[in-house]
Amino acid sequence: IRELKRDIEATIAGTQDLAVENGAGVASQLRGLGDWLDGAAGNVPAAFQTPASSIAATGTAFSETILNNLISSVFRVTGSASNLMLVADTGLRRVIADFARTTSSATDNVRTVNYDGDSGSIKLSVDLYESDHGVVSIVNGNPDCMPAVTGGVANGSGYLVNPEYYGVHELIPMGSTRLPNLGGGERGFVDCALTLGVYHPGAHGYIQAIS
């Protein structure tokens, strides 16, 4: 079941297009979140596509300004300062952790941290980002399941999702089935049938790759 859950996570977070079972070797396949949000023509009606201002395209030097622009772009579509969630791959998460902590000088970079003298730990992670147009909870994406992208920063993809505008719909809930033992030992299988529902692609943001 754990492996099935990981397969589901990788499929939902993927960039693949949908496929319809045809009885001739093509299996049904849901459209991955990356394909829903890439703004490409033909995936969804033009009025509901993810705006270009909500996509940090490949090669973008990611900064706090760009993150704020993505959040503001989502706000312009929904009109609501929603609680958003950023599902970030490892490279993107580390870049965000350095927001407002590094400054460049002519000779060196200076890192600023808050340190409690009574504590033996220094916190460098960022779990919550508050902006003018929404509060973003930042969570780790499973590195085995996030889409493989190319950019200056390895593993730099992420999804800025609005929980009110997506869902997972199950046809067959996840479960296990035991098959009869015909003399070869115990056997069975686990299965699940579901699809990803993206109710408004414009209500989300997409970080494809960063440099």
Where on the chain are the PLM-derived regions?
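Short helix-terminating capping/connector loops at secondary-structure junctions
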Residues: 79-81
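Long, repeat-rich segments with strong aromatic
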Residues: 83-91, 95-96
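Internal, well-ordered alpha/beta segment that forms a basic, Gly-enriched binding/recognition surface
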Residues: 1-5
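Sequence/fold signature of self-assembling virion shell proteins
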Residues: 6, 25-65, 94-211
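A Trp-anchored, charged/polar loop motif used as the substrate-binding/catalytic surface
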Residues: 60-77
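Short, glycine/acidic-rich hinge or "gate" loops at secondary-structure transitions
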Residues: 10-26
